[in-house]
């Protein structure tokens, strides 16, 4: 925003996967949001989104910060503009804006949870591998792909599948 003269609309880019180690991390996006809102000559903020989503935690941090900044700067409107894709966590972020715009061909939405893994129990037995895993502490071998899935692991993922989308809906 350096060198911007006169009233203008600030632009914050959200491109690619939303994750702590990506360009679209909460730290990077939040820093850009703060600069955009704090700039005295910015009259509004555009979130230009092209992201398939990613970490619900990172997206939640950004969502919360947009809400906080909107309260602190109520005169500055936030507009989410989705280009090719604004799915999952990216749509969650867009939901914090005053208005959302997208092209009729944009992919928008896809709120939910995907979690996958593999179970190798039969393969291990078939090729004669005897795996030894030594742990201390509860849940240290949680989601280990080699033994049969425990009932608690399935119940855990069921709770994640139910609770994470609910966060999107209630915020």
Language model feature labels by segment:
Residues 1-76, 85-171:
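Small-residue-centered hinge/linker elements
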